[in-house]
Design a protein with these regions (language model features):
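Alpha-helical transmembrane segments of multi-pass membrane transport proteins
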Residues: 1-426
Length: 426
């Protein structure tokens, strides 16, 4: 299997699409081991037909529907009303928007790119440095990796057979902590660069309440999701169907902004996104079969335990590895490929599976904004028309915040487990 893994990385470095890199490396494993090709076909089909995995395309469609029905601009108006009196207030809007959008987009890269396109021109007009703007818009998108319904957490929970409901609850503490610390970092750096508040005093309570009521349907969505899953009214997969119906209802009945034209365009965009994910899912089943067949998890566990038996040090080593992987691959791909490898190892050294899921998805999402090759780093820098060096140089306080949150989850796991244990029991 190690040869197949090597082939995967070679194809990846040659620029082959991730889905086909996974598929061809899995095919090479079957060829090397002289296994029946019927198993390869069966694994591809059975993985893509998983009922639990159905949540992924449903949430992708729901996220696209919500973005088309006017929720984004209403959330931005509410965030701006709350932060207009703060230093670097458009940067503060970015942090608050990511927290509110966690239940809408589910994708950190999509959230970062969207916020750069929406907030970037206004930041430039107000004289904000382009690199600083790119950094905060990109790194605030990491909040989406923790706030439900994160796509990465759904995949991790499905592949690793971990409670998705507990993962969703666990995301709130690190997600809100990340938001608060990023807002403090924005205040500090905005004072340093002279980015003054847009208003001299906080907005009137009436204005904030008006903006809140206008965006209440978006804010209620993740809360309803958690409640419905917690009380067994619906499974995580069924909640994806609820999310689509909810988005259609909000867009047509309450906001009146979802037209036939925008609905058709949303369906087209969703089909493109879902097709890519489905191909990756199908081929990852073949790849995962090879991991189980060759007992790779035991080999890696023994190798890691040969270095040290200290669980904290082992977890730090795994975090560094995940960060490097995140620079090169999409978070969904990493969750599909590495969860069956790393999760048994973490369980064997006593690391809680829910805590590891939060650490894993935050770290790999951080990787997409980490130089030298983070995909989201290039995306936001390109949108803001600045070199990636400038983004990293001006955004170092925000990078330190994310590192701090990851270390917090490693050394204070009970804080991450507080809400899941409170809601579901220890």
């Amino acid at each position: 299997m190690f040869i197949a893994i090597g082939i995967f990385f070679v194809f990846l470095l040659l620029g082959m699409p991730v889905a086909f890199s996974i598929g061809l490396s899995g095919f090479s494993f079957f060829m090397i081991r002289d296994l029946p090709m019927t198993v390869l076909v069966q694994k591809s089909i059975s993985t893509s037909q998983s009922f639990t995995m159905l949540a992924i395309p449903l949430f992708i469609l729901a996220g696209n529907l919500m973005n088309s029905c006017g929720i984004t601009k209403r959330l931005m108006r509410f965030a701006n009303a709350c932060t207009g009196h703060m230093y670097g207030n458009i940067g503060q809007v970015s942090c608050l928007m990511s927290t509110l959008m966690g239940g809408v987009s589910g994708s950190a890269v999509a959230d970062a790119s969207m916020e750069c396109r929406i907030l970037g021109p206004e930041m430039t007009r107000l004289g904000y440095d382009r690199g600083w703007s790119a950094a905060i818009n990109g790194l605030s998108g990491l909040i989406v990796a923790t706030i439900p319904p994160s796509m990465g957490l759904i995949i991790y929970g499905t592949v690793g057979e971990v409670s998705i409901g507990r993962l969703f609850m666990a995301g709130w503490v690190p997600g809100i902590l990340m938001c608060v610390l990023l807002m403090l970092a924005v205040t500090w750096s905005a004072r340093r660069f002279g980015y003054k508040p847009e208003h001299d005093h906080p907005a009137p309570l009436s204005e904030i309440l008006k903006a809140l009521l206008d965006s209440i349907w978006a804010i209620l969505f993740p809360v309803l999701l958690i409640v419905l899953i917690r009380f067994g009214i619906m499974s995580p997969t069924e909640s994806g169907s609820f999310a689509c119906a909810y988005a259609l209802l909000v867009g047509t009945v309450f906001y009146h902004e979802l037209t036939w034209e925008s609905l058709l365009q949303t369906l087209r965009d969703s089909v493109k996104d879902i097709t890519v994910i489905t191909i990756i899912l199908a081929f990852s089943g073949v790849f995962g079969y090879g991991i189980v067949f060759d007992n790779i998890t035991v080999t890696i566990a023994n190798a890691l335990l040969g270095i040290t038996s200290n669980s904290a040090i082992l977890l730090l080593l795994v975090v560094v590895f995940l960060l490097i992987c995140g620079m090169f691959m999409e978070t969904t791909v990493i969750a599909l490929i590495l969860t069956p490898i790393l999760l048994p190892v973490m369980r064997s050294i006593g690391v809680n599976e829910v805590v590891f899921g939060m650490i894993m998805m935050t770290t790999v999402t951080f990787g997409v904004m980490t130089p030298p090759v983070g995909t989201a780093l290039y995306a936001v820098s390109d949108i803001m028309e600045c070199p990636i060096e400038e983004t990293f140089k001006k955004g170092w306080p925000f990078y330190l915040v994310i590192v701090g949150v990851i270390l917090f989850m490693i050394f204070f796991p009970q804080a991450v487990l507080f809400l899941p244990n409170l809601v579901y029991g220890a």
